[in-house]
């Protein structure tokens, strides 16, 4: 999660050339949105999932861009700058989590969502997988998505508004509205196809930025000797283990557990044209992620030497990338690099808007209007999907209008909330035949509650014992797994169709 608040130092200047680059970037996004709109046929599955026709390259980079958000460009460099190389453990945990997600979840989820009634949302898949005729699990999981993603989306709008405030000295609300209008436009009209293509485009920009800035900074300093100097400035800067503990490392690693339950990421697997394309997507996606994260660490480490060398007073470490990009490069290039920050922020906003819209349309409106109506009134449901994008965005903007630190801190824990409530359920749904509806609901609710309780009442006790300060996804995930397993063994199995479906899924996944 990216929170920008500090103004930039006086050494950082922006001019008309920077504005031109930002304007070009916005125009390209709108053109892609228009392309997505022209390609649309009025089919709900196409609007929400691209008609399951997305290729491996767009799948890989759009998944990465929507996942990393402004955290990779702003948050991680700031963390490395503040704490040194020990911050790298979270990047290792995330990379391993993403790799396992591609390997274990992606193939089966792509096939199973189609086998199980051609589900286009995660709650719809849970409902079909567990034969939930009362739609209880669909409603509960849909509510979790709508509530938490609305808050998640608002944090993205706050980041966009504060970027314009910090980098350009513009009014926060002007920046907020500008970012919102562009994102809403291409998401509203272009749907999933436009969101995926823009995320691909934005993923390319982010990667270029994360390669350029640390390399140029290192060349301006002392080449490879920069890292020796960083270590001399403070020994813990280049030490993987100093400044952290075993439990701290485990907590950072545990971020990887969240991948299996993030709706805006795993929906990319559901939309790919064929599960046979997933190995190619995995290779590209993990390569993109590895290079990008290493670049972010490089920005943080070189920044430790760069900031004092240039006599810069930096109040907020999260502005490190902005400062370095504007001092090191020509305004045109600096504008491109600022566009990379916007790309990171907007790619996540658009993905979350669309997932929330999908849930409102597929998991709630469809229940009200009836399953049969979808077949004969596709355009009505596409219109509802578009209006849902607008409604969610307006609510998120309203919350973001007066940023509240308490809300932003809550949003920062949403990854753990989704990870603890959805990750075990996704894995059990794909691999365990004995999973029951009661087990799924109990485990999902238990995981979410443990995360909330841990954040509200247990984490404040960290000063008493370090174990209370562990990342909340760890106890949430463990409790969710135990509850799901035990309750499923004690309740009625959904039926023989589950075994048939899982065997069919396994057979299709094995096809080369």
Curated annotation (Swiss-Prot):
Keywords: Amino-acid transport, Cell membrane, Ion transport, Membrane, Sodium, Sodium transport, Symport, Transmembrane, Transmembrane helix, Transport. Pfam families: SSF. This is Sodium/proline symporter. One of its GO terms (molecular function) is L-proline transmembrane transporter activity. Catalyzes the sodium-dependent uptake of extracellular L-proline. It is a multi-pass membrane protein. NCBIfam families: Na_Pro_sym, sss. It comes from Staphylococcus haemolyticus (strain JCSC1435).
